[in-house]
Each structure stands twice: as structure tokens, then as C-alpha cells.
């Protein structure tokens, strides 16, 4: 992995492969890496996040997954970002130390979601305690208020953040509040921090206001198409970029109506990649055969601008 190369473009939020009986399946991660790189043209990953069921895994499982992704990604991936957030500060710190020890490109932390921070200082205090355990590793805040219930605006959080967290590098911004994102980018500018958008169906809007790239689950299987959208946006050919975004949105709108989450993402990924991702961990339950058939048919029916 290229050290300290700027993180931009697409980052696949990886799913966690599991065996039929619910254990993590490390044996397919080498195939997974090769698939992302060769088939999807995605060379950055975000491990043990929401899509990876990170908070449903044990600390030992999270360490094993981080190690395997680092091992299999060596020489193939540009960035391996390890999510180390947890409800327990001590566990989050342990995971941060481990990520640093194995050479992770960066660490990310989600806000605690049971006993929640209620203001900027409380949240910053938690983040600082975790970041300090990996003092040479780039640190990212993972903002996803729909899941955590922590709605502290990122614009507010970033004010003076480098004084508390010298390694602070940017934000995984998984919220639809584009005003908050825009104010962050306007005040901090792209050169200082990295802003990676996390709502796949709205990526083009985020790019328009200055996001550096994106972290998302669809880039596991629609990475190549989304990269073409990024290329069109950069030309700029906005009409072509919109076509890609609208078609991604058409697929997501379809599956969301059927019921779409991590379990269904694993099923779609299995179907498209041919790599067995296995079931989710309870309380999530596996996708139905009906869902899998309908989702596959819908995706195959889409006519992309590149003709593939």
C-alpha cells in the first residue's frame, strides 16, 4: 500500500464474509481484493464499518479481519482504512493500537450510540482519546447520525479539531445534510481535510460541492460504473455523469422498496462477484430468494451509457 497517498476517489465499504454457520470467513478475502481491483477498479477499502457489521463482531474478529485485509491487500490496495469505533472507549483504543501496529493507512471512529455524546466537547473528548492511541495514523471521523442518533454538526466539530487531534485527516460523511457538508468544505477547503461522502445515491451532488470522493457499499459491485461517473464529472460532462447517477439511483430505489440493508448487500455481492459472502449476523437475517432474483434481474436490465 502506498503510504500517505491522499485518500480520494472511491472507497469500498467492505462486507464481512461469513460461513453458513456465522463465523467470519477469512479464506475468501484474497478473492475479494482481486475482484475489487480487477473487476471494479477500486483500490481503497473501509473495513469493519456499518456494511462490514463491525459493531456485531467481537474485538478478536475485528482484529483478524483487519490483519487479513492488510495482508491480502499488500501491493494491490492503496488505502486500507480500519474502523475502530466501539461503544467501549477501551475497546476502541485497543483496536486503534492494533490498526497502528499492522500498518493501517488510517483509522475511523463512529460516535458511541448507546450512551451518546450530547455536544461537541463530549464527542471530541471520545475521539481524541482513541486517536491518541495511534499517534502516527491518519484519523477520520465517521459521521452517520441515522445510525448513531448523534446529530452534532460536522461543521461545528471541525472547528479547531487539529488542536485536539493532530492526526485528524477528514470525515466519512454519511448523512444527507449537504448544507453541513458544504459549510465544512467551504470553511476548511479540500486541501486541508478529506471529505468522503457516504450516501451513494447522492454522490454526484456531493461532488458538485467539493467532496473528494466516497465510501459506500455499492462500490463493491458498481465501482467501475461509479468511477466512470467520476471521470465524466471531472471532464466535465455533467450530462453523462447524471446518467450514471440516475441509473445507480434507479437500482437503489428499486431494492430499497423491497427492503435493502447489509444482509441484502451481501446477497447482491455474492450474486455479482461469485464470491460467497455468507449470511449476516443476528439480529440481521439473510435476504430472501425472491429479493435476490428481483435485484439481479433489475441490475441486469439496466443499460449503462458505456454499453456494458
From Swiss-Prot:
Report any Pfam family annotated for this entry. Answer: DHDPS
Instruction: Give the family this protein belongs to, as stated in its UniProt record.
Output: Belongs to the DapA family. NanA subfamily.
Q: Name one GO biological process term.
A: N-acetylneuraminate catabolic process
> What reaction gets catalysed by this protein?
aceneuramate = aldehydo-N-acetyl-D-mannosamine + pyruvate
In UniProt terms, what function does this protein have?
Catalyzes the cleavage of N-acetylneuraminic acid (sialic acid) to form pyruvate and N-acetylmannosamine via a Schiff base intermediate. It prevents sialic acids from being recycled and returning to the cell surface. Involved in the N-glycolylneuraminic acid (Neu5Gc) degradation pathway.
Q: Which cysteines are disulphide-bonded?
A: none
**Sequence positions that bind aceneuramate:** 50-51, 174, 198, 200-201, 217
Reported EC number(s) for this entry are: 4.1.3.3
Report the main location listed first in the record.
cytoplasm
* Superkingdom as given in the UniProt entry: Eukaryota
Where is this chain's protein located in or outside the cell? Cytoplasm
GO cellular component terms listed in the entry, alphabetical order? cytoplasm
**What SMART domains would the database entry show?**
DHDPS
Q: Please give the name of this protein.
A: N-acetylneuraminate lyase
Q: Where is the active site?
A: 142, 172
Entry GO MF terms? N-acetylneuraminate lyase activity
How does it associate, per the subunit comment?
A: Homotetramer.
What keywords is this UniProt entry annotated with? Carbohydrate metabolism, Cytoplasm, Lyase, Schiff base
Against PANTHER family, the record matches this protein to:
DIHYDRODIPICOLINATE SYNTHASE, N-ACETYLNEURAMINATE LYASE
| Pathway this chain belongs to | Amino-sugar metabolism; N-acetylneuraminate degradation
